[in-house]
Amino acid sequence: YSSYGGQTKNPYNLKRDPSGSSSGTAAAVAAGFAPFGLGSDTSGSVRGPASVTGTVGMRVTYGQTSRSGVIPLSDSFDVTGAITNTVEDQALVLDAIVGPAEGDVATLQATQDTQYEKSLAQASLKGARLGIVNVFNGGNSEVDETFKAAQNELEKAGATLVNINLDK
């Protein structure tokens, strides 16, 4: 929400809420206004909006990215994360923003050892075991079909899917 512009809209369905405090960033990226944006995440403020706008959001490890300019809800838990349109874009942005930052003591031990973009090998899911929770299926057939198609793609990429049953 913005006091200037009002309620942020989900660009894929203007009747749907874009979720979370980084919803403006996610909506802007999803609408094509920017190739990426940054948001702060305490308990889902990057990941929630990404999940409902068809974008990619990731919570980085605490201390890996600068929180300069962020007013923290929890100084020992808040992180800055990117919202992008693709996993590849996410990796490129992480390569640019991960590392020590002057003025943010939490990042003093941050390392730039990982090269995220170079880590995007096709074989990266070979041998991975991923838990699949199906308790949410059945509410929307279109979502169920998309979820199943995603599972098929994960298996094609070499992942082993393990069904997880949650007690209701």
Briefly describe each language-model feature range:
Residues 42-45, 136-139, 168:
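Solvent-exposed loop/turn segments at secondary-structure junctions
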Residues 160-167:
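General small-molecule cofactor/ligand-binding pocket signal
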Residues 35-36, 129, 160:
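Beta-sheet entry/capping signal
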Residues 1-97:
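Short glycine/serine-rich loop segments
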Residues 157:
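Conserved dinucleotide-binding and phosphotransfer motif residues
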Residues 56-150:
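A short helix-breaking turn/cap at a secondary-structure junction
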